[in-house]
Amino acid sequence: MAKEQVQAITKMEEDFAQWYTDIVKKAELVDYSSVKGCMILRPYGYALWENMQKVMDEKLKATGHENVYMPMFIPESLLQKEKDHVEGFAPEVAWVTHGGDEKLAERLCVRPTSETLFCEHFSKIVQSYNDLPKLYNQWCSVVRWEKTTRPFLRTTEFLWQEGHTIHETAEESQAETLNILNLYASFCEDYLAIPVIKGQKTEKEKFAGAKATYTIESLMHDGKALQTGTSHNFGTNFSEAFDIKFLDRNGKWQYVHQTSWGVSTRMIGGLIMVHSDNNGLVMPPKVAPVQVVIVPIAQHKEGVLAKATELQGHIQKVARVKIDASNKTPGWKFNEYEMKGIPIRLEVGPKDIEKNQVVLVRRDTKEKEFISMDQLEERIPALLEEIHNSLFNKAKVFRDENTYSVTNFEEMKKLADEKQGFIKAMWCGELACEEKLKEEVASRCMPFEQEHLAEECVCCVNKWCIGEKRINALLDRKDEKDFGLHNKCNPKSFLVLQFVSCIFKMEG
């Protein structure tokens, strides 16, 4: 039975999408519901989310953020107040049109995100600069009517946190936006062992209604990218639309400066696709629901279960631990907990008790060692840290080995046909060049850590963006000085690009 269970996992090299689906099902993270695109988070999957939520919640509260809860329904008239925002979400909105048998006077949107609700509330409670800042966070579910779904990565309903803050100055809101992005990045790296690239989205890729959108991007096992979290600076775009004003220190009315940011259960999907293997899930230790499983060997023999229970008592001081005292065979248990990705397995039997030792097996490397029972409380925390570092370093090496630099469009196109991963290239910032790039690749971000890869933009070097169409667009600005500057390519940033075949990207 155990072998059949393991063999049922499709190899990632054969079909990555099916491999992923096999793992989330067989590791008992989720089950499918009767509603298309909605998943049931099983106890093991929800415990993982709870651990992630607990860490994030503590970090947000430590920086002065307060938890609130907004309604799940948004009146259509309220949603329409920010035009760009509405257009960005319109295809994904679910509408409530009836209450019982009665048709509603106004349609209600099932929240795809809660900006409009927070804005309405802020407009009622803010009068003076003394009322600022407001640093709010919400843990909830949202609904986006996706056509193509996959557990954790793209679902009709999903769990997330969304933060919404308002500030007195533009500088404060920008600092908040970047501080949260850094918080997300450190959470991914320090708890999920996922290396990320921090950067800014292009004007075309930014969140609907935002002044600027910042992102953390990760590379999965199959060489495709995942947007793991985003932080948005709204400037005064929403506060002007919703009339969120305050009396400043000089007695003048000003619009508040606003931010919005969020991460979701998509992080669990990223965790799976970065660390897991063809034997099942591999859990980063710091968020694993169970960090150590004890498997008694020949548990029917006198003293074995008692010793396992005694060891559990010691280990639970330093780690999350369970004993499997079921009647299943040790072999079945080994395969089961390998499938579920528990970082450390301890085996204890009569011979081990005689020697005052246990057999310790790492899930990530499958390395086995014999260790004295007296050393477990010291060894296990150190080993959990070793496993975390090993997973992070392995993922970082994979990302770096699958990141390429190009200097012209043809080189980029050839690379996109032959490889999977990230491409780094210079970009001048012009929309015409970005449109040309997107014919072959998907833009991910403009990384904060810049490199000077070439003297010209990857498209400008081929003269595609400085022809008649571009000149006309610049002439429409009626600014000859500006035209003169832009007619000569002056790349100031580079894009991390990811191949167009990516199926896991979901905005928001």
From Swiss-Prot:
Broadest EC class assigned to this enzyme: ligase
Subunit architecture: Homodimer.
Matches recorded under PANTHER family: BIFUNCTIONAL GLUTAMATE_PROLINE--TRNA LIGASE (PTHR43382:SF2), PROLYL-TRNA SYNTHETASE (PTHR43382)
Pfam families (UniProt xref): HGTP_anticodon, ProRS-C_1, tRNA-synt_2b
Molecular-function GO terms, alphabetical: ATP binding; catalytic activity, acting on a protein; proline-tRNA ligase activity; transferase activity
Primary role: Catalyzes the attachment of proline to tRNA(Pro) in a two-step reaction: proline is first activated by ATP to form Pro-AMP and then transferred to the acceptor end of tRNA(Pro).
Transmembrane feature ranges: none
Gene: proS2
Species assigned in the record: Bacillus anthracis
Keyword Aminoacyl-tRNA synthetase attached: yes
Highest taxon of source: Bacteria
Protein name as catalogued: Proline--tRNA ligase 2
UniProt note: domains: Consists of three domains: the N-terminal catalytic domain, the anticodon-binding domain and the C-terminal extension.
EC number: 6.1.1.15
Family: Belongs to the class-II aminoacyl-tRNA synthetase family. ProS type 3 subfamily.
High-level lineage: Bacteria, Bacillati, Bacillota, Bacilli, Bacillales
InterPro entries documented for this protein: aa-tRNA-synt_IIb, aa-tRNA-synth_II, aa-tRNA-synth_II/BPL/LPL, Anticodon-bd, Anticodon-bd_dom_sf, Pro-tRNA-ligase_IIa, Pro-tRNA-ligase_IIa_arc-type, Pro-tRNA_ligase_II_C
Tagged with keyword Iron-sulfur: no
Chief location bin: cytoplasm
GO cellular component, one term: aminoacyl-tRNA synthetase multienzyme complex
Keywords for the protein's UniProt record, in alphabetical order: Aminoacyl-tRNA synthetase, ATP-binding, Cytoplasm, Ligase, Nucleotide-binding, Protein biosynthesis
Catalytic activity entry: tRNA(Pro) + L-proline + ATP = L-prolyl-tRNA(Pro) + AMP + diphosphate
Any one GO biological process: prolyl-tRNA aminoacylation
Compartments (UniProt record): Cytoplasm
